[in-house]
A protein has these predicted regions:
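Amide-donor transfer/coupling interface in amidating biosynthetic enzymes
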Residues: 1-26, 137-197
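Short acidic low-complexity segments
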Residues: 55-64
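Cysteine-nucleophile active-site neighborhood
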Residues: 75-149
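Fold-independent oxyanion-binding glycine-rich loops
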Residues: 30-33, 57, 72-74, 115, ...
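C-terminal accessory "lid"/substrate-recognition subdomains
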Residues: 1-56, 70
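Electropositive phosphate-/nucleotide-binding environments in soluble metabolic enzymes
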Residues: 36-40, 87, 156
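Conserved acidic residues
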Residues: 67
Length: 197
């Protein structure tokens, strides 16, 4: 969802073109110690689309009945073992994705959608949901930070990039969009899409 702020060094575009849906959706949002980077603006936009229910992947909540699942950022690397043990929830998410369910994931949420997550050098590669055919690692972590402009299917979206994690073999899936810094320089961070994920 586009943010409503105009970032420095970017042209004015229709960032206020967001129109709430007439159909009210059921939206499930992961919220617990592993998934807690939740921006108020995202909740405001999602609230305009429908009713929100929170669930906890770390503490083993079932996946709520939903039209959209939002997996925000956080620290899944600190809870990789606990997440790995949530087989029922991970299977429910895989089934949901394969049957066309809509999942919006960013940062830590995307890490949960990969095949595995390795938290440290020499550490265990814990199996995650496996929805995306990628492996995520904190080994060699470095900060990826800055305002971003994304070109996707004729739309321009704006936001920011902030993460330390890396995807092993990021070209295993093609990026569906190009990303640029606020100054217009292309960045290599991919944007992944699989079905409605």
């Amino acid at each position: 969802f586009p943010c409503r702020y105009t970032l420095p060094y970017s042209s004015e575009t229709g960032v206020e073109s967001f129109t709430p849906s007439a159909k009210k959706m059921k939206i499930a949002i992961a919220r617990d110690p592993a998934f807690n980077f939740i921006y108020r603006e995202n909740i405001d936009r999602l609230s305009a689309l429908g009713s929100i229910t929170y669930f906890s992947p770390v503490y083993g909540s079932d996946l709520p009945d939903a039209d959209l699942v939002y997996l925000p950022g956080g620290y899944p690397e600190l809870f990789a073992r606990q997440l790995h043990r949530r087989k029922k929830l991970m299977e429910a998410l895989r089934t949901y994705a394969e049957e066309g369910g809509k999942i919006l994931a960013e940062c830590g949420g995307m890490m949960f959608l990969t095949r595995s997550l390795t938290a440290r050098q020499g550490g265990t590669a814990y199996a995650m949901t496996g929805i995306l055919p990628l492996d995520c690692t904190m080994v060699g972590a470095r900060l990826h930070l800055g305002y971003r402009r994304i070109e996707y299917k004729g739309m321009e979206l704006r936001g920011h990039e902030f993460h330390y994690s890396n995807v092993v073999a990021p070209d295993a899936m093609p990026s569906v969009a190009k990303q640029f810094t606020a100054r217009g320089m292309e960045v290599s961070t991919p944007l992944y899409r699989y079905k409605n994920v």
